[in-house]
């Protein structure tokens, strides 16, 4: 009963809250990806986080524990960028269904080595075990 009262109070006090989207004519789809390395002390798995924008408006975000244990920050960031790419491709398809065509998708990643691997995905001894 106490939980129900809290929910009703929350809904009542937040009825004026909302999300504001600008009338930005920029319809460029972009994604920001980040990951922490071995952030979970119990199983040493990393967590990926992604934010997706159309123009200047945030339209989606996600946070997910990665399925595998990364051996480095580069691997964790590369896996996060791959997940971000997958989501962006789905969003590109969805926007295309609404008549908004995207020719280029941009992914922002803060790890130089992960960016270099994505530009040249040749299997090196340090990267051949990575599965996305």
Question: For the regions a protein language model found, what residue spans apply to each?
Answer:
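Divalent metal-binding acidic/histidine catalytic loops
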Residues: 1-132
